[in-house]
Every structure is written in structure tokens, then in C-alpha cells.
């Protein structure tokens, strides 16, 4: 599971990275998903993002993506100053089709998505796929600039 631990006395529910992250990244690599060649793995600094990104880095290597085309960035819980990180995303994406894989946790998603909009980054240029954003966090922001960005989640309550 996310911490790569096992126990005969523990039963996990929810998607593991091989059920959530790998199919999502396969989509980003496909023509329909934009045929990304470069990836920014952006997450909150704790076990889930670090383990998921370790798995994704190995998966991307298996698809021929080199380390120079993968950047990992971690922020503390509650982080809100995304100006520099988003500016670096713009610079990194100048060298080819880039996607952001977000494992940002909780409320930190709001300032991240707001900063993407502030700097004019659209999903048609640099798509973001999120594994840790909830519907509740997005209710408080203007989602028009987010159209085209993606989320891979087990369940969306607002979807019929």
C-alpha cells in the first residue's frame, strides 16, 4: 500500500497507486491525454506522495522517460506560496510536453490552482492530474480556469 507495508491484521480500502496513479499517467502518456514527455511530481511532504512518486518514477522510466524529464517537488502541510513553484513549472514545460502529477494534500490545493490561473497556465498547455484533491476544496474557488485539468479518484459524490 502507500507506505509499502503489509500486515495480516490490516485491511486497506481505497485505491492503491497501481490502481489510481498508473492508469492516470498512462492516459497522460497517450495521444488522447496529450502525449506528455516531461513530468513534474508535485506533492505534500509525507508518505503517500513520496511512495506514489517513487512508483511513478519507476513506471515512467519503464516508458522511456529519463530523469532529466522528471522533476519532484515537495511542500510542507498547509503550504500556500506557490508563485515560485508555478513559475518553475512554466520554465520546465518550455522544453516539451509537460504534465503535473499532483499529490498536494487538502487545503493547499486551493492556492496551487489559484496560482496556476494567476500565471496563465491552462490545461491545454500543462495539464494537472490530481490524486489528492477533493470536491470540497474546489467548491471555494473559480473553477473556470481549471477546465481540462483532471482528478483520479475512487468516487466523486457530485457526479451522477
Predicted regions and their residues:
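Extracellular/periplasmic periplasmic-binding protein-like sensory domains
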Residues: 7, 116-160
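Short clusters of hydrophobic/aromatic residues that line enzyme substrate/ligand-binding pockets
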Residues: 1, 10, 149
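Extracellular/periplasmic Venus flytrap/periplasmic-binding protein
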Residues: 8-119, 159
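Gly/Ser-enriched beta-turn/beta-hairpin loop segments
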Residues: 3-5
Amino acid at each position: 500500500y502507500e507506505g509499502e507495508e503489509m500486515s495480516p491484521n490490516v485491511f486497506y480500502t481505497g485505491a492503491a497507486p497501481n490502481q489510481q496513479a498508473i492508469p492516470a499517467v498512462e492516459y497522460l502518456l497517450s495521444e488522447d491525454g496529450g502525449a506528455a514527455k516531461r513530468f513534474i511530481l508535485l506533492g505534500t511532504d509525507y508518505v503517500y506522495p513520496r511512495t506514489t512518486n517513487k512508483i511513478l518514477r519507476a513506471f515512467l522510466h519503464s516508458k522511456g522517460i529519463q530523469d532529466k524529464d522528471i522533476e519532484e517537488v515537495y511542500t510542507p502541510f498547509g503550504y500556500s506560496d506557490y508563485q515560485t513553484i508555478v513559475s518553475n513549472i512554466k520554465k520546465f514545460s518550455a522544453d516539451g510536453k509537460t504534465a503535473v502529477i499532483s499529490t498536494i494534500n487538502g487545503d493547499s490545493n486551493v492556492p496551487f490552482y489559484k496560482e496556476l490561473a494567476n500565471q496563465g497556465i491552462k490545461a491545454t498547455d500543462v495539464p494537472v492530474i490530481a490524486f489528492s484533491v477533493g470536491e470540497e476544496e474546489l467548491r471555494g474557488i473559480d473553477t473556470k480556469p481549471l477546465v481540462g485539468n483532471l482528478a483520479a479518484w475512487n468516487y466523486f459524490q457530485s457526479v451522477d
